[in-house]
């Protein structure tokens, strides 16, 4: 909701989960192969391939599967279904990493949410090296939370009574490309970026107070302000 892009640079953000889900099904197979199938394609590889040589958006799943079966004499078959539109800025990649980590590693015993999050962030780094971990965190724990890269998350218990409407333009954008553009701006305009970061940081603190006071109209106005900073 607040602090996107700035969160990569250690600024606090406010995150909110939505009612769209990713479903990942994982099954053990006798054949020692990793097979991944989704609406965006298919990937079938032997275990222990070099991650850096895999040119596929499905490689986070391969990373997780390969890690899970490294001491096992078996393979994995993974099926992915997503309700989240791709390239719409709704964290579909992170949600996939979280669902993938949970589905795959639960085949081999109990796993905590903390461990699922750790594995999901590792997997996401195969496609977004400088991930903040924000989207993986809210996908793991759900609800409304404040988050920063250095201190982790804190659930916001005073959830305001309002509904968010998300409009999808159906114009896909690359997260990697947008993150690179922000980094380029930060490198060339240090002073301006620091000024914007300070403004965003204050905005987030103001919004946290408004949430506690359940001031919906004012929160909406802050959303517009957040968009201007972006």
What kind of feature is each model-predicted range?
Residues 5, 40, 82-84:
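Short, histidine-centered active-site or binding-site loop motifs used for metal coordination
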Residues 7, 15, 23-66, 106-110, ...:
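C-terminal nucleotide
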Residues 20, 90-113:
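DPxDG-like acidic metal-binding loop motif
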Residues 20-22, 74:
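A generic structural signal for short beta-strands and their flanking turns/coil linkers
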Residues 55, 90-98, 131, 194:
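Short, conserved micro-motifs enriched in small and acidic residues
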Residues 63-87, 119-122:
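Glycine- and acidic-rich phosphate- and metal-coordinating loops
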């Amino acid at each position: 909701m607040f602090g996107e892009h700035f969160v990569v640079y250690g600024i606090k953000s406010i995150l909110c989960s939505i009612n769209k889900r990713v479903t990942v099904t994982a099954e053990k197979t006798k054949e020692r192969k990793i097979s991944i199938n989704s609406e965006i394609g298919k990937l079938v590889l032997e275990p222990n391939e070099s991650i850096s040589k895999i040119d596929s958006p499905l490689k986070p799943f391969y990373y997780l599967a390969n890690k899970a079966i490294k001491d096992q004499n078996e393979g994995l078959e993974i099926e992915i279904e997503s309700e989240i539109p791709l390239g719409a800025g709704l964290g579909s990649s992170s949600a996939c990493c979280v669902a993938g980590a949970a589905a795959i590693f639960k085949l081999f015993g109990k796993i905590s949410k903390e461990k699922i999050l750790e594995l999901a962030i590792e997997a996401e780094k195969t496609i977004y090296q400088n991930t903040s971990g924000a989207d993986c965190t809210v996908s793991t724990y759900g609800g409304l939370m404040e988050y920063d890269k250095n201190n982790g998350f804190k659930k916001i218990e005073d959830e305001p009574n309002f509904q968010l409407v998300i409009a999808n333009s159906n114009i896909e954008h690359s997260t990697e490309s947008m993150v690179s553009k922000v980094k380029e701006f930060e490198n060339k305009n240090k002073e301006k970026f620091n000024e914007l970061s300070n403004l965003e940081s204050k905005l987030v603190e103001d919004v946290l107070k408004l949430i506690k006071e359940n001031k919906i109209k004012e929160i909406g106005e802050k959303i517009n302000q957040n968009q201007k900073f972006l």
